[in-house]
């Protein structure tokens, strides 16, 4: 085992803070409508230019291992916030940095770290309650468009696209984002379906950056049993390999030996394949598989229907124009099923809904109906260059996630104003001792940091703006885009409540853990062995 280096107390915390500051200082310049760009170097191809906080955070690896630990912990704040709410990564990073900077000063001055953490936790719980109280529902198209615009870094065309997509497929409908062929953004609604099962192995992923599998014009095999013997699949795999197309397998399960064979063949390029588990359970699973078979024009391979897997051939496969698989979901777009068969299937489900006895059965049938009839909205992102395309696609993805979060939990005034207004909930809140009270005061001050950073990025004087906003009430705030004050909601500057809440909770959680850190352990980097000296050339015989 390699020797380890151990740092304690202030030395450990100082190293950790250096790492946090390096990452946070790179991320926070992107905050707000006048946030700056960050250029990310790539091992090949053009550098990426982005204003997306989580993309910047993901690129940062520091040489000093102890500083890197601090950076990686705060990177987790950004990633967690992005996973839960789809946006707010920069806000979470700024909050974590502000809390940690002041918290570590307090610990160095002799305060009890555990009591500081308890004070921060107590204040966080109160602020979350206040944010929920300040929240307003987001249901009308105008609010949805405004949230999408803000989350896409004030790009109004993206906000309108997302609002239009939600209007066409419903707020719970499936919306996907893909790269377009032209310079303009487009919105298409196609026949499609999404279900909550992802790939059985991450080795099926074709896009390593996003860990997604994208299959263009694939064949689709639908089976209701476990696949344990790869021999049963050989005729299908050979046929698909000859065709040069991809194959999506939807089955109850694929057991280890068969799965390993599929993975190896996929990685070697023998046949492009992806296997996913069938959605649902029991009879409901069979019904959902029949829905997918109808949508894609596949034959449902089931022993109940006297069909065995080893007897299947290419004629039993369905097709779709595109399939996207993530670790959690599978989206089938534009299946090749006959319109008459799909309409007939929809009518059968409608009849079942009318006859359903329980609310649960009715709800599940309505889910199936929505999947089969709702379609999928596809936002095609247009751009002039590949670098612009990638950056814009990331922004549209973020905006889509944030808009869904707004529909789910409502909206609050944006631009850091909601956190300033929530400060009043901490009036009169006290802990069990002075150190806990200081923890509460720490968070009270830290929640001003996002507004201060927005103003700083816009070239303004943050203290003046913060005092002006605090002197007023309600949704009154600062619009950094045009350097004016006013009602943030009326100006269309909104944040999803879920985004603000998640950013606050994740930042407070990580800051509390780091404040209470007393030791850090890392491997000692071994020095590379010196190169051996080159041998001299031997004397040639016969020379004097």
Curated annotation (Swiss-Prot):
Quaternary structure and interacting proteins, as annotated: Forms a cylinder of 14 subunits composed of two heptameric rings stacked back-to-back. Interacts with the co-chaperonin GroES.
Its biological purpose: Together with its co-chaperonin GroES, plays an essential role in assisting protein folding. The GroEL-GroES system forms a nano-cage that allows encapsulation of the non-native substrate proteins and provides a physical environment optimized to promote and accelerate protein folding.
Keyword match Kinase: no
Any one Pfam family match given in the protein's UniProt record, by short name: Cpn60_TCP1
Gene symbol of the encoding locus: groEL
Binding site for ATP: 30-33, 51, 87-91, 415, 479-481, 495
Subcellular location: Cytoplasm
UniProt GO BP: protein refolding
Catalytic activity field: ATP + H2O + a folded polypeptide = ADP + phosphate + an unfolded polypeptide
GO molecular function (one): ATP-dependent protein folding chaperone
A GO CC annotation given for this chain: cytoplasm
Organism per entry: Francisella tularensis subsp. tularensis (strain SCHU S4 / Schu 4)
Similarity remark: Belongs to the chaperonin (HSP60) family.
This protein's record includes keyword Endoplasmic reticulum: no
The protein, known as: Chaperonin GroEL
Keywords: ATP-binding, Chaperone, Cytoplasm, Isomerase, Nucleotide-binding
NCBIfam families the UniProt entry points to: GroEL (TIGR02348), PRK00013.1 (NF000592), PRK12849.1 (NF009487), PRK12850.1 (NF009488), PRK12851.1 (NF009489)
EC number, UniProt record: 5.6.1.7
């Amino acid at each position: 085992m390699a020797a380890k280096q151990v740092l304690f107390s202030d030395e450990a915390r100082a190293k950790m803070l250096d790492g946090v500051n390096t990452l946070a200082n790179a991320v926070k310049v992107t905050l707000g409508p006048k946030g700056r760009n960050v250029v990310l170097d790539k091992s090949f191809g053009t550098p990426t230019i982005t204003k997306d906080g989580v993309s910047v955070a993901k690129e940062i690896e520091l040489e000093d291992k102890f500083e890197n630990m601090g950076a990686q912990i705060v990177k987790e704040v950004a990633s967690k916030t992005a996973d839960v709410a789809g946006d707010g990564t920069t806000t979470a990073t700024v909050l974590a940095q502000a809390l940690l900077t002041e918290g570590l000063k307090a610990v160095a001055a002799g305060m009890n770290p555990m009591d500081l953490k308890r004070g921060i936790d107590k204040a966080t719980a109160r602020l979350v309650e206040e944010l929920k109280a300040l929240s307003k529902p987001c249901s009308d198209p105008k609010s949805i468009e405004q949230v999408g615009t803000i989350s896409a870094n004030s790009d109004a065309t993206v906000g309108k696209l997302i609002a239009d997509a939600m209007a066409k497929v419903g707020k719970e409908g499936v919306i996907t984002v893909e790269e377009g062929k032209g310079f303009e953004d487009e919105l298409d609604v196609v026949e499609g379906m999404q279900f909550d099962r992802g790939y059985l192995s991450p080795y099926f992923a074709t896009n390593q950056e996003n860990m997604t599998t994208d299959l263009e014009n694939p064949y689709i095999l639908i089976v209701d049993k476990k696949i344990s013997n790869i021999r049963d699949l050989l005729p299908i795999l050979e046929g698909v390999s000859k065709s040069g197309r991809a194959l999506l397998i939807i089955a109850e399960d694929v057991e280890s030996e068969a799965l390993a064979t599929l993975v190896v063949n996929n990685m070697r390029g023998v046949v492009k394949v992806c296997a996913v588990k069938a959605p649902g359970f029991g009879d409901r699973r069979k019904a959902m598989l029949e829905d997918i078979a109808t949508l894609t024009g596949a034959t449902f391979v089931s022993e109940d229907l006297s069909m065995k897997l080893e007897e299947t051939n290419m004629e039993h496969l369905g097709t779709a124009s595109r399939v996207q698989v993530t670790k959690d979901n599978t989206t089938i777009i534009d299946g090749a099923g006959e319109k008459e068969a799909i309409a007939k299937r929809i009518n059968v489900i409608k009849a079942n809904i009318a006859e359903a006895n329980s609310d649960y059965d009715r709800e599940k049938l309505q889910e199936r109906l929505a999947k089969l009839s709702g379609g999928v909205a596809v936002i095609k992102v247009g751009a002039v260059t590949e670098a612009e395309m990638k950056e814009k696609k990331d922004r549209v993805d973020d905006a889509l996630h944030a808009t869904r979060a707004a529909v789910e939990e409502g909206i609050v005034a944006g631009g850091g104003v909601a956190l300033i207004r929530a400060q009043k909930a901490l009036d009169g809140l006290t802990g069990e001792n002075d150190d806990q009270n200081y923890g509460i005061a720490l968070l009270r001050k830290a929640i001003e940091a996002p507004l201060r950073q927005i103003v700083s990025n816009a070239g303004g004087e943050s203290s003046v703006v913060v005092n002006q906003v605090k002197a007023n009430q309600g949704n009154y705030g600062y619009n950094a885009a045009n350097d004016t004050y006013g009602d943030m909601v009326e100006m269309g500057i909104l944040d999803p409540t879920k985004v603000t809440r998640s950013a606050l909770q994740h930042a407070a959680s990580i800051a509390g853990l780091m404040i209470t850190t007393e030791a850090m352990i890392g491997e000692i980097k071994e020095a590379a062995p010196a190169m051996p000296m080159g041998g001299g050339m031997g004397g040639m015989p016969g020379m004097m």
